[in-house]
């Protein structure tokens, strides 16, 4: 590295050789060479420009809730956007920066008596991550409420994408197809009754707590739903609930979750994912595709 990122950006918190297990919801993941925590779009843009100029590999993550970082970690510069978290409501719109928590965004919408985001009340991710994968729950998904998304291109240019340009599909948006980085999102909502909005959010959070193993570290829903099947039922019917590899276990509460019950590693998670895929395919002929984003490098043996 010809220039030191720490010396170049004294105003931005940057950590060297930092374990990403401190930031992922699974509490697993290897070290990142450098982790930066920008607080604004301008700081993020400056970091991207620096990485390009220095030929540094660049990885951007949000709340790391539906993410597995392999035990070998991530080379180059990793940007975590969770300090870019401003949210404001204006008229029937809510604008949220990419690092804002979805849960916090739903609370702002409710406070402004705006309806449409209730389905997301318990989704643990960031706004940017939710757009990246078109997150959804309880019959709703981001594609139904997003108006525009502002991104930084790999060249460091700001660009606004409208709904059609995002080409939303099941757990997919065009953000996955390019190297653009989401920096803010505008949600188009409708006027509603605040009491009813809050009641619906409370109802969904109660449902989520009853059905999902929220008391354990996990990466949320591991697999996409195959057409014509329910993922949890396939895994349950394969007899895999309670199966453990290392410290990773298929949840007894919800078969679609793999939880960290005893100091699991990312390798435990990867081994469990592959095992579940293998058994379900052997039993039912169905290939489970991962919904969780998997990044980073394997541990170098030697």
UniProtKB/Swiss-Prot annotation:
Entry annotated with the keyword Translocase: no
- Which PROSITE patterns does this one have? FAD_PCMH (PS51387)
Q: Where in the cell is it found?
A: Cytoplasm
Query: Known EC number(s)?
Result: 1.3.1.98
Locate the transmembrane regions by residue number: none
- Major place of residence: cytoplasm
Q: Which residues form the FAD-binding PCMH-type domain?
A: 27-192
What's an example of a GO molecular-function annotation for this chain? UDP-N-acetylmuramate dehydrogenase activity
- Which Gene Ontology cellular component annotation is one that this UniProt entry carries? cytosol
- What cofactor does its activity depend on? FAD
Which Pfam families does the record cross-reference, listed alphabetically? Answer: FAD_binding_4, MurB_C
Q: In which pathway does it act?
A: Cell wall biogenesis; peptidoglycan biosynthesis
Sorted keywords for this record are:
Cell cycle, Cell division, Cell shape, Cell wall biogenesis/degradation, Cytoplasm, FAD, Flavoprotein, NADP, Oxidoreductase, Peptidoglycan synthesis
Active-site feature positions:
171, 221, 291
Which GO BP terms apply?
cell division; cell wall organization; peptidoglycan biosynthetic process; regulation of cell shape
In the record, which residues are listed under signal peptide? none
Catalytic reaction equation(s): UDP-N-acetyl-alpha-D-muramate + NADP(+) = UDP-N-acetyl-3-O-(1-carboxyvinyl)-alpha-D-glucosamine + NADPH + H(+)
Query: What does this gene product do?
Result: Cell wall formation.
Q: Family, per the entry?
A: Belongs to the MurB family.
| Name this polypeptide is given | UDP-N-acetylenolpyruvoylglucosamine reductase
Species:
Lactiplantibacillus plantarum (strain ATCC BAA-793 / NCIMB 8826 / WCFS1)
């Amino acid at each position: 590295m010809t220039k030191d990122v720490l010396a170049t950006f004294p105003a931005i918190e940057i950590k060297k050789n930092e374990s990403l297990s401190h930031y992922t919801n699974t509490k697993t993941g290897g070290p990142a060479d450098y982790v930066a925590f920008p607080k604004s779009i301008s700081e993020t843009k400056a970091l991207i420009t620096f990485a390009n100029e220095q030929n540094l590999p660049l990885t951007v993550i949000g709340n790391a809730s539906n993410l597995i970082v392999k035990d070998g970690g991530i080379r180059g510069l990793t940007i975590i956007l969770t300090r870019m978290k401003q949210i404001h409501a204006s008229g029937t719109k809510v604008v949220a920066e990419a690092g804002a928590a979805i849960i916090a965004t739903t609370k702002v919408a409710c406070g402004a008596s705006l309806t449409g985001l209730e389905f997301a009340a318990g989704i643990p991710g960031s706004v940017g991550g939710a757009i990246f994968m078109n997150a959804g729950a309880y019959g709703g998904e981001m594609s139904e409420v997003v108006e525009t998304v502002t991104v930084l291109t790999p060249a460091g240019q700001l660009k606004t994408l409208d709904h059609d340009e995002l080409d939303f599909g099941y757990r997919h948006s065009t953000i996955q197809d390019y190297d653009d980085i989401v920096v803010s999102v505008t949600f188009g909502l409708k006027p509603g009754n605040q009491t009813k909005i809050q009641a619906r959010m409370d109802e969904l959070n109660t449902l989520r707590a009853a059905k999902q193993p929220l008391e354990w570290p996990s990466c949320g829903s591991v697999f996409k739903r195959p057409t014509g099947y329910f993922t949890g039922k396939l895994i349950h019917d394969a007899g895999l609930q309670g199966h453990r590899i290392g410290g990773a276990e298929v949840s007894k509460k919800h078969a679609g979750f793999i939880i960290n019950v005893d100091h699991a590693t990312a390798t435990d998670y990867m081994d469990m994912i592959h095992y579940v895929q293998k058994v379900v395919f052997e039993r039912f002929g169905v290939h489970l595709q991962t919904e969780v984003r998997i990044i980073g490098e394997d541990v170098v043996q030697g």
